[in-house]
């Protein structure tokens, strides 16, 4: 009987063991290929966002300075003034590595950072903070889970230090992913229990396996590889060879005029046709009761700030506006939006994060927005005027003064004068 079982299952077990050994002992390092790295940097796929190998390879390239651009879906709004296009056209000293997806916010970004901590150390980054992230209940667990994987989990468990940030991250992970792998270890962290030697040995073993698995399968990744032509290359020939903001503005303004011709809301024609037009009447005053002042996202943002402080990262934060015509039509309250911006800025500035490009009042400028909430055309140009000088003249991170009160529910639900928060 045992012999028959071995004849059936033995080959499967041997094959599984060989695959495990192949992956476990596969080299974690990948050879640099600038062309491939440029393509993965602008792929804006779920894979390029949440997987380790492609972003680590690019961010560790000694011959090209790729800079993490953290955000959500704004990176997908390509045109002639998009930061990836301008950096390539004018051969700047850096290239953006675009990290974001629709529905992603600070919690996903934090866990993604755990995969590339050595590549963040003492570096500059760009971080877009969209006030729309700060909804009452935060974002849906399904959205979080879509951008989370086992490598992020073991990277987090390996690097956590048992501090308040680690405890909070573990608690949020259980909320967003109740059936997460290694749940017992995550629960220990959330409960402030110390991990045992056996726990740490298992984490280290699985972390090495996940890292090598990412390297092994990353070499076969082609998803998004051919998007470079659509996202970047097609715009290069439309821009003037000699850099000039005025000349670039003339080009992208003409493009914007052509592509916002079918609506009175200043939105790109395609977006208006596919996302707004059919429901236009229903959308009137649909956001009049929205508030972004009370949200767990404020605590999630503190996770990111804590990581930046630990890694001595020098970030510039971008706060985008809402399309003013859309804001008025949908009934979104301007005073609430600006109060949200002030709350975000207070959390940043009071802890020493003072590099902020605040465009929150520019949503009424012509051709500033691509759609309802995303920058485009002249908005990207304004973005570039703030970001390019920052990245082209690197400086070390300042000294930060973290305040753990920003992890509290009191702060997450506070809607008063920020200067009076105790």
Predicted features, each with a name:
Residues 64-66, 94, 121-124, 310-315, ...:
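Loop/turn elements at helix/coil->beta-strand transitions in domains of secreted/extracellular proteins
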Residues 71-72, 128-132, 270-279, 318-323, ...:
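Short loop/turn segments at strand-loop or loop-helix junctions that form parts
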Residues 35-36, 156-300, 403-422:
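Secreted/periplasmic serine-hydrolase-like ester/acetyl group-modifying domain
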Residues 30-94, 111-113:
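Membrane/wall-proximal cationic-aromatic binding patches
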Residues 4-26:
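Hydrophobic membrane-insertion alpha-helices, especially the h-region
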Residues 88, 293-299, 304-367:
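Extended hydrophobic/aromatic segments used for targeting, binding, or gating
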Residues 99-101, 336, 342-422:
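C-terminal regions of proteins
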Residues 75-165:
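Membrane-embedded segments
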């Amino acid at each position: 009987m045992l012999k028959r079982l071995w004849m059936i299952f033995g080959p499967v077990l041997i094959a599984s063991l060989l695959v495990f050994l192949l992956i476990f002992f596969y080299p974690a390092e990948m050879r640099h290929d600038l062309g491939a790295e440029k393509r993965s940097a602008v792929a804006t796929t779920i894979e390029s966002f949440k997987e380790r190998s492609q972003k680590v390879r690019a961010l560790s390239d000694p011959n090209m300075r790729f800079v993490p651009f953290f955000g959500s879906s704004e990176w997908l709004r390509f045109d002639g003034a998009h930061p990836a296009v301008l950096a390539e056209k004018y051969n700047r000293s850096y290239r953006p590595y675009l990290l974001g997806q629709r529905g992603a916010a600070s919690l996903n970004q934090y866990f993604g950072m755990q995969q590339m901590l050595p590549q963040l150390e003492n570096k500059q980054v760009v971080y877009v903070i969209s006030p729309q992230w700060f909804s009452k209940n935060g974002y849906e667990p399904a959205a979080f889970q879509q951008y989370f994987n086992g490598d992020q989990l073991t990277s987090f468990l390996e690097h956590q230090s048992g501090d308040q940030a680690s405890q909070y991250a573990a608690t949020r992970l259980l909320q967003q992913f109740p059936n997460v792998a290694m749940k017992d270890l995550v629960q220990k962290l959330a409960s402030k229990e110390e991990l045992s030697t056996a726990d740490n040995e298992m984490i280290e073993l699985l972390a090495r396996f996940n890292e090598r698995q990412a390297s092994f399968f990353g070499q076969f990744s082609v998803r998004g590889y051919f998007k470079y032509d659509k996202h970047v290359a097609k715009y290069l020939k439309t821009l003037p060879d000699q850099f000039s903001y005025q000349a670039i503005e003339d080009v992208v303004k003409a493009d914007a005029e052509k592509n916002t011709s079918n609506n009175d809301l200043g939105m790109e024609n395609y977006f208006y046709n596919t996302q707004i037009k059919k429901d236009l009447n229903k959308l009137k005053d649909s956001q009049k009761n929205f508030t972004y002042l009370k949200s767990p996202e404020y605590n999630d943002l503190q996770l990111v700030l804590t990581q930046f402080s630990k890694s001595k990262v020098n970030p510039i934060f971008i706060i985008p506006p809402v399309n003013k015509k859309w804001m008025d039509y949908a009934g979104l309250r301007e005073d609430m939006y600006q109060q949200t911006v002030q709350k975000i800025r207070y959390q940043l500035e009071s802890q020493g994060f003072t590099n902020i490009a605040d465009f929150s009042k520019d949503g009424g400028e012509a051709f500033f927005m691509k759609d309802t909430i995303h920058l485009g055309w002249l908005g990207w140009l304004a973005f570039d005027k703030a970001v390019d000088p920052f990245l082209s003249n690197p400086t070390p991170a300042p000294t930060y003064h973290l305040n753990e009160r920003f992890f509290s529910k009191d702060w997450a639900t506070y809607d008063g004068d920020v200067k009076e928060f105790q």
